[in-house]
Structures are given as structure tokens and as C-alpha cells.
Amino acid sequence: MMRFDPSRRSFLKTSVALAGTSPFLAGLLRAQSHDAGAPLMAYVGTFSSPLQDVLPTQVDLPPGNGRGIHLFQVNRATGAMTPAGEHRMGTSPSCLAVNGAGTRLYSANETDRVNDSGEGSVSAFAVNPADGQLKLLNTVPSGGAGPTYVSLHPEGRFLLVANYFGGSVAVLPILADGRLGEATDVKVDAGTIGPTRATHAPPGSFAFSGHDRTHAHMIQADPSGRFVLHVDLGLDRIYVWRFDEQKGLLIPNDPAGVSLPPGD
């Protein structure tokens, strides 16, 4: 019998696998609006290997059975999705982001380990406009362990990364050919860890996991690109940064963020 894991972490990762294609669809719909004959593609990130460094007090996730990035062609009239192949990766590309032109895709490789510190990685891909297939451009360190979220800065010259197990966020420059450069900035979260159970959330909710250490879980720029926000679910805090678009630096804002009720 399948065991239901009510942790917030497990729920969110399942949701990402099911709904994580929406940024791609939005970008590619804009890019392909002038060419109705071009394929409309959806890409789904998966867990393709177990999380080796999960602490016993942290979430209990089963080994992933995905095979990397799964590709689907979307029927423009009905929305039906037809399998169109897969880009095999054993590093759990669990979160994906595609640029507005639909020509580049970036993946957070959550279970990759690229050096002795256990740092994860992020990969850049070129998207073939004829058939939507992916070609790996390069892979670089993510600035911390367990990269779980990636998003593009509105100007398109930087990729923002949240590293769940490292409790850090990073800024990676996007080079002219779409490849990723080394991080221009890395910030490590610090502070008092919240309680295991939520203060206000009712029993059975998803708000009772991730309070064993810092866990950066999401990072996003505002539409103007002047500010970047990221959340740490271990600290129950939203960080606010001013963004230096010339150097790719995160500068503490005043105020530097907001703390939320513990566990909520």
C-alpha cells in the first residue's frame, strides 16, 4: 500500500513535477505566436535519484523514478500532451526555467554533487526550434547543496538559484550563447530555526517540515528587476534584496526582510 507523506516538502515537489511546466508554456507561447507550425512543447522536471543527504528528522522522500527531463508536445487546439522523448539525467532536474524566447532551458539538479562540499549544480540547454529537443550547453556549481528552485531575472542576463539543503541563494550570469558562468554572488541564510509544528496551522496541514536547519526554497525577482526576494522555510522568513544588474550582486535592502509566524 502506498504511504502518504503529508510533509510540505513532499507536497511541493509533487506539485512542481505536475505544474512546473507553466513558465515554459508562457514563454514559448509568446515565442511561437508568429509560427503556428512550430511545435508547442512542455518540459517536466523529475526526481531521478534519491536524496542521499536527507536527515532522519527531515522529510522522508522515496527514491525518484523519473529519468530526467521529460518532453511533451502540446496540442494547440485541445491542450493534450503527447510524449516527445526525454533528456536523461541522473541528477534530479526537479525545477526548470525557460527564457522568454523559448530558446534556452535551465534546470536545478537537486541531487548532483560536484565537489567535496556537496554543492549541487545547474545546467543550461539549447532548445531546438524545429522539434523542441534539448542540447546540453554546460553545467556549473549552484552555490550550495540541493538546488531546488531556479528563475530568470527579467533582463535575461542572470539565473537566480535557491539551494534547499545549503540554505543559500546564488546569482549565475547567463553568457551570450546561453551557457552559465560562475556565480557572481552567493548568500547563506542564518538565524533562529522555527519550531517543528506550525503555530496556527491545523493538524494535518503541510506546514510542519523543514525546521531542522535553514532551507532556501524559492527565489524570484520583481517585474522591474530592481529587487529580488527569497524565502527560507526553516527560518520562516522572506528576504528582500536590491539587485545590482551590472555586477549580478544581491545587496541587503532596508528593511532586509520580514519574519512570518513560526511554522506557518
For each of these PLM feature ranges, what is it?
Residues 37, 100-101, 154-155, 223-224:
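Residue-level detector of Asp-centered blade-edge/turn motifs that repeat once per structural unit
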Residues 49-52, 111-115, 166-167, 235-236:
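Short glycine/acidic-enriched loop and turn motifs that connect beta-strands
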Residues 3-4, 10-31:
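N-terminal export signals
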Residues 73-78, 126-132, 173-181, 242-249:
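Short loop/turn segments immediately following beta-strands, especially the blade-tip
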Residues 82-87, 136-140, 205-208, 254-259:
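A short beta-strand motif characteristic of beta-propeller blades
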